[in-house]
């Protein structure tokens, strides 16, 4: 029996993985390995030996598939739970603030009601006294003296003053309640303005940090360029020193040759120091032309090239920083997109067939065919074909359908 290439090693690697790292495709690899083991048992002991075991194994693999798929969904659920907890905490804080405000209003209202009740009780008492006095006046035939009449007028005047004072207190408390409401509205507006200012300051702080990083990077680049220029300057100075030494040697050699040629040439050379310098300059130019490492540019041209290179480097660095900044903003905007609500599956919908059942359906058909024909050769051919097609197409069609159902 020929086994399909690539399936057992993949299954073995899936078995060696950590439990938290398993995927649905690893479960399918394990199912393929179990199918191979079933095939070997059928070859050795027949189909009846695993007829009762196979449905249980299929059920266990289905449970494993569901658990693995849920494990991959767990991080997203944790994030949603954290967001829900945060919203609940904010809601509880808001409710607590409203409750405190309501309690304050209730306390003020209770105080006002108590004072109003006291004043009403005083009014009722005064009215009762007034009624008693009126009844006494009706039952008594004795006429009131002028002093008693003035006393009665004083009592009625006192009642009017009490009523006036009560009205003033009620109006004052009503004005205080309105002022408290206006003050609360102003406080809420101040809080909203402070929140907006906080967000604006956070954005400004982020931009300033970005600029500071850019400036620091530019400073580092300038320091590196300074070090490079200093190193180049040192090398140039060393080269100039070596050239000066060679020039001195050449001058000494020329002077020795001229001294050997005779006194006449020495006499001609001594009154013409400018000519010697011109000859030495010409020899130096000839020597430089023969030197393969002679400088091709002037010092000003070299400085211009280095300055242009530094400017281009700084521009490239700024463009890279801006590109990274815009990419981070796009990522933040994508993360701010509201996530769709979780899909609720109705309980009445029938449970779809899992990928494990589809994986073993072909093998179960081969098992029935083996029981009918009693020829093991058909099992070899069918299971080989099943293993190859399952390994090739299991990740594309059946696996994807199983994932969609889950």
Curated annotation (Swiss-Prot):
Q: Where does the record place the modification Phosphoserine?
A: 7, 259
User: Which SUPFAM superfamilies does the protein's record reference?
Assistant: RILP dimerisation region (SSF161256)
Where does the protein end up?
A: Cytoplasm, Cytosol; Cell projection, Cilium; Cytoplasm, Cytoskeleton, Microtubule organizing center, Centrosome, Centriole
Reported modifications of this chain: S-nitrosylation is required for the interaction with GAPDH.
The RH1 domain covers 10-97
InterPro entries, sorted: DZIP_RILPL, RH1, RH2, RILP_dimer
Which intervals hold domain RH2?
294-359
Query: What's in the keyword line of the UniProt record?
Result: Cell projection, Cilium, Coiled coil, Cytoplasm, Cytoskeleton, Phosphoprotein, Protein transport, S-nitrosylation, Transport
GO cellular component labels = centriole; centrosome; ciliary basal body; cilium; cytosol; nucleoplasm; plasma membrane
Q: Which PROSITE patterns match?
A: RH1, RH2
What processes in GO biological process is this protein linked to?
Answer: epithelial cell morphogenesis; protein transport from ciliary membrane to plasma membrane
Q: How does it assemble?
A: Interacts (when S-nitrosylated) with GAPDH. Interacts with RAB8A; interaction is dependent on the phosphorylation of 'Thr-72' of RAB8A. Interacts with RAB10 and RAB12; the interaction is dependent on the phosphorylation of 'Thr-73' of RAB10, and 'Ser-105' of RAB12.
What does the UniProt record say this protein does?
A: Neuroprotective protein, which acts by sequestring GAPDH in the cytosol and prevent the apoptotic function of GAPDH in the nucleus. Competes with SIAH1 for binding GAPDH. Does not regulate lysosomal morphology and distribution. Plays a role in the regulation of cell shape and polarity. Plays a role in cellular protein transport, including protein transport away from primary cilia. Binds to RAB10 following LRRK2-mediated RAB10 phosphorylation which leads to inhibition of ciliogenesis.
Q: Which PANTHER family match?
A: RILP-LIKE PROTEIN 1, ZINC FINGER PROTEIN DZIP1
| Similarity annotation | Belongs to the RILPL family.
Q: What protein name is recorded for this chain?
A: RILP-like protein 1
Gene that this polypeptide is encoded by: Rilpl1
